[in-house]
């Protein structure tokens, strides 16, 4: 499948392109408050680098939160606009579920994502499955 993946839930602003289920390019910038300015350019450049049209995509995956409210709105708006324009399925991807995929631990544990100041988003997991 040809999938465009968009990340905007945190300070990371980025996108990845998967062609035939293989990651062919990833472009991300770890800098706060640049999503509105940079994310459309990142997506444009990814597609341009691989001579792709939006209509050639079979799905658009986008981080669905929790995370930065403004970042999520920007990422979701871009993804939804592209999906609607190309009549392509939109695939929401929960942020905590993705972070949990990198953990191989049994028992109960928490996945945390910095929110702002001294606040975090958290979700409890039990042996890899959501527990809250």
Task: Give the positions of each predicted feature.
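Surface "functional belts" at beta-alpha junctions
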Residues: 22, 34, 89-132
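DPxDG-like acidic metal-binding loop motif
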Residues: 59-90
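Phosphate-handling active-site elements
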Residues: 48-55, 84-93
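N-terminal beta-alpha supersecondary unit
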Residues: 1-64
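Glycine-rich nucleotide phosphate-binding loop and flanking beta-alpha elements
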Residues: 12, 68, 117-119
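Short amphipathic alpha-helical face segments that pack within enzyme cores
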Residues: 38-41, 77, 98
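Generic, well-ordered alpha-helical segments
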Residues: 31, 35-38, 70-74, 92
């Amino acid at each position: 499948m040809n999938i465009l993946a968009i990340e905007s839930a945190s300070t990371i602003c980025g996108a990845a392109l998967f062609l035939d289920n293989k990651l062919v390019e990833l472009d991300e910038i770890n800098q706060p408050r640049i999503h509105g300015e940079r994310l459309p350019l990142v997506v444009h450049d990814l597609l341009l680098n691989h001579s792709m049209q939006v209509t050639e995509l079979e799905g658009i995956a986008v981080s669905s939160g929790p995370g930065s409210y403004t970042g999520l709105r920007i990422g979701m708006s871009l993804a939804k606009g592209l999906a609607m324009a190309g009549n392509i399925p939109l695939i929401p991807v929960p942020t905590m579920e993705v972070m949990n995929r990198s953990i191989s631990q049994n028992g109960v544990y928490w996945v945390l994502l910095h929110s702002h100041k001294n606040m975090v988003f958290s979700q409890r997991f039990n042996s890899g499955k959501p527990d809250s």
